[in-house]
Amino acid sequence: MALPISKVDFLIFMCLIGLGSAQLSSNFYATKCPNALSTIKSAVNSAVAKEARMGASLLRLHFHDCFVQGCDASVLLDDTSNFTGEKTAGPNANSIRGFEVIDTIKSQVESLCPGVVSCADILAVAARDSVVALGGASWNVLLGRRDSTTASLSSANSDLPAPFFNLSGLISAFSNKGFTTKELVTLSGAHTIGQAQCTAFRTRIYNESNIDPTYAKSLQANCPSVGGDTNLSPFDVTTPNKFDNAYYINLRNKKGLLHSDQQLFNGVSTDSQVTAYSNNAATFNTDFGNAMIKMGNLSPLTGTSGQIRTNCRKTN
């Protein structure tokens, strides 16, 4: 008996939307480049050992890549006389970093397996390995992404959430990429590591009331009302170089660094999820890994789409 046409259409639709992620596999390089993952891990561990902040920087690179036209390494492309990349976008300029580490990794895997391992996959694996290097839990990275030949400055300016966003803006930015409000709270936990520049939180520490006064004053010492724009302060004041659930504990104590951080715990719908994670690190770790897998599945180029760049900074 034939299915009603509506059900047939639905089944076809479900097959199509699953096609992209179905082509990604955790063992994609098992035979093509068996030492790729260990090479990436070693390079990340070395970079993070030299500078703990680099772990957060590599994690952020993957996020800023995936939120702009999918996980395709477009964020790594340099501007040229006839090509405009995403590095000069407002959320990226003088902010995202770690490109040299990615260059090093790419050079190493190219020497092992020329033209096999994509820059997009390097970003995904480096993000996971950075979290692990700083004490966080691991997750199963799906692989097989290819690299874009295009970038979108306009999308980088419009799609990435800003530090001054209210909760509604954050929910919208993440919803536009298919994430639930819970997953917004989960992925925001990446701010348990890393640092932000004074310009990102100056307004908060001088003008907002939902901030611990002692915490605000300590930040003001390093972030004057005028000047010191690039001075850095850690997102997590308690364990800045450890990937844990302290970010959520800090939010409950009104010690969120950015306006957008504290928006997650401010007498709003997300308060309960922040509280849950502050009380259960294991749940946070599990949810974070699952959310990262989902993020890594944002519009990947697979099969014959895109290319495998030889140099992550430019197209072949």
From Swiss-Prot:
Residues of the site described as Transition state stabilizer: R60
Glycosylation positions in this chain: N82, N166
Cofactor(s) the protein needs: Ca(2+); heme b
Tagged with keyword Iron: yes
EC number of the protein: 1.11.1.7
Molecular function terms, GO-annotated: heme binding; lactoperoxidase activity; metal ion binding
Disulfide bond annotation, renumbered to this chain: C33-C113, C66-C71, C119-C312, C198-C223
Modification type Pyrrolidone carboxylic acid: residues: Q23
Keywords carried by this UniProt record: Calcium, Disulfide bond, Glycoprotein, Heme, Hydrogen peroxide, Iron, Metal-binding, Oxidoreductase, Peroxidase, Pyrrolidone carboxylic acid, Secreted, Signal
UniProt-listed Gene3D superfamilies: 1.10.520.10, Peroxidase, domain 2 (1.10.420.10)
Subcellular location(s) per record: Secreted
Coiled-coil stretches noted in the UniProt entry, renumbered to this chain: none
PROSITE patterns in the cross-refs: PEROXIDASE_1, PEROXIDASE_2, PEROXIDASE_4
Residues annotated to bind Ca(2+) 2: T192, D236, T239, K242, D244
Annotated signal peptide: 1-22
GO biological process: hydrogen peroxide catabolic process; response to oxidative stress
Record: active site: H64 (proton acceptor)
Binding sites annotated in the UniProt record for heme b: H191
Enzyme class: oxidoreductase
Record bears the keyword 4Fe-4S: no
Cofactor note: Binds 2 calcium ions per subunit. Binds 1 heme b (iron(II)-protoporphyrin IX) group per subunit.
Coarse class of the protein's main subcellular location: secreted
GO cellular component: extracellular region
Residues that coordinate or bind Ca(2+) 1: D65, V68, G70, D72, S74
Protein name: Cationic peroxidase 1
Organism the protein comes from: Arachis hypogaea
Lineage per the UniProt record: Eukaryota, Viridiplantae, Streptophyta, Embryophyta, Tracheophyta
